[in-house]
């Protein structure tokens, strides 16, 4: 669904079931959790609305000032390129607690984009200012075939606007739910593309921190695009912040220990497990029990998992950081060289010169919304001028 790609190619199906549902917005079926500076203890919602407190933890990321200067020097300027008048708002693609995502069309080049709109007052009230600014920064730095592209940002007195690629094929999550589970070659294909995206992010000292099927979109050809960088962060050494989606959170995060890129490889293992099994290994309807299982439960496999994938997952979903693949001396190479990935030609995959296992049934080319749910449209009040009490908090937008 990249705004730079041309439509084409025949339609393929996976188990004769087709992916649909909403363009990725700010929230999804499995809610994320986060702490931020000034909000160090986290209330974790339980079934029935009860809450339990997670332990307080420091909000610290270790790096020196010179390192950070070199990192942000890579960033593209995102503000000043566009304004609301440059686009026609067509329909809502997704909604969330911070705002909504719209399908828009440029009045200049006719291309379709996704516009993520966040309400400043809500972002501030929910203490997500740092994560919102980090999302803009990370997306202004990354450029990769399997990662969403942000084209620019702007703001008014009440909202923040982020202009992104529009990805027509929908969420991997939707396809997985319709398919119940993926055959081994299909899961391997998506996992390999995710692996390359993680390798790229980690090469820039960015940890993603919220890997799950809901945050993976499929373009018109069936290749992935990782989206939603709200929890991504520059971490050259270690950090402490509790964030992520409970089923996917690594044990070192749950136990409030310092962590680094290792947490993405744990989540990568959970992703592979869910794609193959149709469920996550430590799921419980009670979030606190999920955390307990992550810390203590034995990793069990369905009988149809083959030996190679069981070996890979046992090396990814391990609490021993000295044994977790991706976190060892050879980094991502240890993951890519595992026998489960032996058929993957990584160079061809990176160049997208490989047939995908599923091609979304897009009929009308760019701007097609057939893979997304419909949302009730609301009267919008964008472009508000006047006093902005939060101007200093979002100055880079």
From Swiss-Prot:
GO CC entries: cAMP-dependent protein kinase complex; chromatin; cytoplasm; cytosol; nucleus
Subcellular location: Cytoplasm; Nucleus
UniProt modified residues of type N-acetylserine: 2
Biased composition (Basic and acidic residues): 13-33, 42-56
Transit peptide recorded as keyword: no
EC code(s) of this entry: 2.7.11.11
Keyword Transferase found: yes
GO molecular function: ATP binding; cAMP-dependent protein kinase activity; protein kinase activity; protein serine kinase activity
Keywords, comma-separated and alphabetical: Acetylation, ATP-binding, cAMP, Cell cycle, Cell division, Cytoplasm, Kinase, Nucleotide-binding, Nucleus, Serine/threonine-protein kinase, Transferase
Pfam families: Pkinase (PF00069)
Class of the enzyme per the UniProt entry, highest EC level: transferase
UniProt-annotated binding residues for ATP: 93-101, 116
Enzyme active site: 210
Domain AGC-kinase C-terminal: 342-397
Domain Protein kinase stretches: 87-341
Gene Ontology process terms (BP): cell division; double-strand break repair via nonhomologous end joining; negative regulation of cytoplasmic mRNA processing body assembly; protein import into nucleus; protein kinase A signaling; Ras protein signal transduction; regulation of macroautophagy; signal transduction
Catalytic activity entry: L-seryl-[protein] + ATP = O-phospho-L-seryl-[protein] + ADP + H(+); L-threonyl-[protein] + ATP = O-phospho-L-threonyl-[protein] + ADP + H(+)
Modes of activity regulation: Activated by cAMP.
Region (Disordered): 1-60
Something else known: Present with 4320 molecules/cell in log phase SD medium.
Protein family membership: Belongs to the protein kinase superfamily. AGC Ser/Thr protein kinase family. cAMP subfamily.
Protein name as annotated: cAMP-dependent protein kinase type 1
Organism, scientific name: Saccharomyces cerevisiae (strain ATCC 204508 / S288c) (Baker's yeast)
Origin organism lineage: Eukaryota, Fungi, Dikarya, Ascomycota, Saccharomycotina
Encoding gene, per UniProt annotation: TPK1
């Amino acid at each position: 669904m990249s705004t730079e790609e041309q439509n084409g190619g025949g339609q393929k199906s996976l188990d004769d079931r087709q992916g649909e549902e909403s363009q990725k917005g700010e929230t999804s079926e499995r809610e994320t959790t986060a702490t931020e500076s000034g909000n160090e203890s986290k209330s974790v919602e339980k079934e029935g609305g009860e809450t339990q407190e997670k332990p307080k933890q420091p909000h610290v990321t270790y790096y020196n000032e010179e390192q950070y200067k070199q990192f942000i020097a890579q960033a593209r300027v995102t503000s000043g390129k566009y304004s609301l008048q440059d686009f026609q708002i067509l329909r809502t693609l997704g909604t969330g607690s911070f705002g909504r995502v719209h399908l828009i069309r440029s009045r200049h080049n006719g291309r379709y984009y996704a516009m993520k709109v966040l309400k400043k007052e809500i972002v501030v009230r929910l203490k997500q200012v740092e994560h919102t600014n980090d999302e803009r920064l990370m997306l202004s730095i990354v450029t990769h075939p399997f990662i969403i592209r942000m084209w620019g940002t702007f703001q008014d007195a009440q909202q923040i606007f982020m202009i992104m690629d529009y990805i027509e094929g929908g969420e991997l999550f939707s396809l997985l739910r319709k398919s119940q589970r993926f055959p081994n070659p299909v899961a391997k294909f998506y996992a390999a593309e995710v692996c390359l995206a993680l390798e790229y992010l980690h090469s820039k000292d960015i940890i993603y921190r919220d890997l799950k099927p809901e945050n993976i979109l499929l373009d018109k050809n069936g290749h992935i695009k990782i989206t939603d960088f709200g929890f991504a962060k520059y971490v050259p050494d270690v950090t402490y912040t509790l964030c992520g989606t409970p089923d996917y959170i690594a044990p070192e995060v749950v136990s409030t220990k310092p962590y680094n890129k290792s947490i993405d490889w744990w989540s990568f293992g959970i992703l592979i497990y869910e794609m193959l099994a149709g469920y996550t290994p430590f799921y419980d309807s009670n979030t606190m029990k999920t955390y307990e299982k992550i810390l203590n439960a034995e990793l069990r496999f369905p009988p149809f998992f083959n030996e190679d994938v069981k070996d890979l997952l046992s090396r990814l979903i391990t609490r021993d950081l000295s044994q977790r693949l991706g976190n060892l001396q050879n980094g991502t190479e240890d993951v890519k060289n595992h026998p489960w990935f032996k058929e993957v030609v990584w160079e061809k995959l990176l160049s997208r010169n490989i047939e995908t296992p599923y091609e979304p049934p897009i009929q009308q080319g760019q701007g097609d919304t057939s893979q997304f749910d419909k949302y009730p449209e609301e009267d919008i009040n964008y472009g508000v001028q006047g006093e902005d009490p939060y101007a200093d908090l979002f100055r880079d937008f």
